[in-house]
Amino acid sequence: MCGIVGATSERRVTGILLEGLKRLEYRGYDSAGVAVIDADNHLKSVRRTGKVQELKDAIEQNPLDGTIGIAHTRWATHGGVTEANAHPHRSEDEIAVVHNGIIENHERLREELQAEGYVFNSQTDTEVIAHLIHHERKTHGDLLAAVKSAVRQLEGAYGTVVMDTQYPERLVVARSGSPLVIGVGIGENFVASDQLALLPVTRQFIYLEEGDVADINRTEIDIYDSEGNAVEREVVESDVSYDAGGKGQYRHFMLKEIYEQPIAVRNTLEGRLSEISVLDNAFGENAADILKDIEHVQIVACGTSYHAGMVARYWLESMANVSCNVEIASEFRYRKSYVHPNSLLVTISQSGETADTLAALRLSKKLGYKGSLTICNVGSSSMVRESDLAFLTRAGAEIGVASTKAFTTQLTGLLMLTLGIGKYRGMPEQQQEAVVHALQALPTKLEEAVSLADEIEELAQDFANKEHSLFLGRGNQYPIAMEGALKLKEISYIHAEAYAAGELKHGPLALIDEEMPVIVVAPNNDLLEKLKSNVEEVRARGGLMYVFADKNARFKGDDSLTVLNVCHCDEVIAPIVYTVPLQLLSYYVALIKGTDVDQPRNLAKSVTVE
């Protein structure tokens, strides 16, 4: 969600901070700010609502010069979208703080600090941290000790960076429930919430663990664990492309990432399949020791990743012969649930930092699961580090808030997991081999799906003035209908709902009229004839139908029924292939409506708060 950048250097850092914020815009935000300590040891800051460019323009009018500074993009939680609520927050013109997360006991701390004479200028929970650290520094006489004492009093999640005019070369950072990464330079060091922000200045990174506090200056980095012990954390060289944050020839990141799906899936498959099945080491060392005993799979995820899990349930139960439950992470973690014997906990997250999913993973360690596996796109993430097994999707950096290539590579990984478990559960070798061949054909099928873009762009014109829409699917295409509805509402702001087509008579049929477009994701299996009956029910009531169907399904269009013929593919990979036309439909509808495709209102890319 919010983005953090900090730097301590021998050179001026304002440009570094602004470039870092620019590279974090994809995370979603509504205001931004920068603070530096200048040559006279004065704290200077500029904050603005709106885009980073507006902040940059303001700084050009009132330059900020300093060799140490912090910066932030805010996504409002406590308090409205105002300049006063934007970060960095200050205390007594000495302490400046940026913070990601939510402090749950901020009201009590605010009252205590007000009683001590501190004056609050915002509605945020973050300003509490600034005043609390200032108060503790008066007691302890040192910034590091003050931060350690302050964070022990915080309840909730935080990733925070602090600077102090009394220590004008130091940044003190702390994380609990919100990720932070330190960038290691030569004569300079950095900190950020995402390594993408720092790729222009370093490729050497230290990923802080839960509960870590770090004291950073230009030449030294001292890290302390949650018990206060000095620790060494590994320095990792990033292989993420420097230009991963660029759009190239494409108008939007989302379109670029839709077109990248064939290569992203090809990369995800590379080196992980034999001729007859999936290699166990695709899921980590000693994966076979866990997978061979699995009798049940519990999938936990949020949003688009939850839809991927729902598709996987069909695969796992029909081919791998294991039972499977799929639950939204924010529900799973707050209820008592039954843990089946020999159960595998599977978390799915693009970032590996999704707050509720990460909390569910940590909860599972107390519940008796056989093991945990994460399907994730970020190898350095908390979920990867804290899971027993990990499948990395190799999608590359995904910048658009609406997930595209992360989703299709998650589905690819989940189908491979079905093979990985199924081969120990009696899945016939002939069936395994057929799935392998389908996966090997998948990148080419995705290229064919992307080639429908011009046809879908024309189709999108029909949706430009609609306020509502209905998506229908059956079998493993039902979750794809859900994903299509989510994409349309996310980026075009058209209200969209998805239903299993068999539920049409149980309520949704009441909504059908000539103003309600109905999008149908048609399976090419024994459910096809059932779905054709549902189509006729809608047509009989004057509904406008748009059917995405296998070109061999022989759907015939007319004035009330538009058919988009999708390339023929193996039934097992159809949910992945049919995802692409629905993504393109959402993109082109949003383009026509003039919405912010890459940064839709009120949404964030990485949801790192509850």
UniProtKB/Swiss-Prot annotation:
Keywords from the named record: Aminotransferase, Cytoplasm, Glutamine amidotransferase, Repeat, Transferase
Gene Ontology MF annotations: carbohydrate derivative binding; glutamine-fructose-6-phosphate transaminase (isomerizing) activity
Localisation: Cytoplasm
Record-annotated active site: 2 (nucleophile), 605 (for fru-6p isomerization activity)
Catalysed transformations (reactions): D-fructose 6-phosphate + L-glutamine = D-glucosamine 6-phosphate + L-glutamate
Glutamine amidotransferase type-2 domain mapped to chain residues: 2-219
EC id: 2.6.1.16
Pfam short name (any one): SIS
Superkingdom field: Bacteria
One GO location term (cellular component): cytosol
Residues annotated as domain SIS: 287-427, 459-600
GO BP: carbohydrate metabolic process; fructose 6-phosphate metabolic process; protein N-linked glycosylation; UDP-N-acetylglucosamine metabolic process
Principal EC category: transferase
Task performed by this protein: Catalyzes the first step in hexosamine metabolism, converting fructose-6P into glucosamine-6P using glutamine as a nitrogen source.
Oligomer and partners: Homodimer.
Protein name: Glutamine--fructose-6-phosphate aminotransferase [isomerizing]
Species: Idiomarina loihiensis (strain ATCC BAA-735 / DSM 15497 / L2-TR)
Gene, per the UniProt record: glmS
